[in-house]
Design a protein with these regions (language model features):
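Short helix-loop-beta junction
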Residues: 19-27
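Cysteine-nucleophile active-site neighborhood
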Residues: 50-122
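Extreme N-terminal starter segment of soluble prokaryotic enzymes
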Residues: 1-4
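Short acidic low-complexity segments
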Residues: 29-40
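Short acidic/histidine-rich motifs immediately flanking catalytic phosphotransfer sites
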Residues: 38-48
Length: 206
């Protein structure tokens, strides 16, 4: 099995690849921006951390943008943090166009609703499973995962919502559709629960 971890110069790429190697020691995990490698892989992971305008610009500059879009159509696909946000139509940060694969936007946590909570949302928080999914196998609803973000996805289609979290507001932190699963939290930083989710992704047959 070949797993492509898309490298477009933003964030936590190596920690994601190391976590995948740990849960799938027999897999070939390749950190790459090569469109040919991405298209030839069996599974694709798009991590990312930072500002959405920078991430979208870097993805385009890397040459991997179209290969990532193609992967969302026909391969098991995992988006992490910005890799989740970019699937939507537009990010509030810099009024940035996303890939437009999913209807909805990416707003900032509303200051009026935060009641003294700091933004960015940084640290451990509970994830409530909104519906069953193969990637939740062996993970309890309410399990804690690690977050670092100031913006969150707001899907137009409530049917996409697969996990939610509370931080001043209730927000979507996991979505799924067909071969796509994406999370706002960082499984590679989330210890046993995060490794279980990555292991489930490696074994997933959508």
């Amino acid at each position: 099995m070949n797993i492509a971890v898309v490298d477009y110069g933003m964030g936590n790429i190596r920690s994601v690849s190391k976590a995948l190697e740990r849960v799938a020691p027999r897999a070939q995990v390749e950190v790459t921006s090569d469109p040919g490698v991405i298209r030839a892989s069996d599974r694709v992971v798009v991590p990312g951390q930072g500002a959405m305008p920078d991430c979208m610009a870097q993805l385009a500059a890397s040459g991997a943008r179209e290969a990532v879009i193609a992967a969302t159509r026909d391969k098991p696909f995992l988006g992490i943090c910005i890799g989740m946000q970019m699937l939507f139509e537009r990010g509030e940060e810099g009024d940035t166009p996303g890939l437009g694969l999913l209807a909805g936007g990416v707003p900032r946590f509303p200051a009026a609703r935060m009641a003294g909570l700091k933004v960015p949302h940084m640290g451990w928080n509970q994830v409530r499973q909104a519906k069953p999914h193969a990637l939740w196998d062996g993970i309890a609803s309410g399990e804690r995962f690690y977050f670092v973000h100031s913006y969150y996805p707001a899907p137009a289609d409530a049917g996409l919502v697969t996990g939610t979290c509370e931080y001043g507001v209730s927000f979507t932190c996991a979505i799924s559709r067909d071969n796509i699963f994406a999370v706002q939290f960082h499984p590679e930083k989330s210890q046993a629960a995060g490794l279980r989710l990555l292991s489930n992704f490696v074994q997933w047959r959508p």
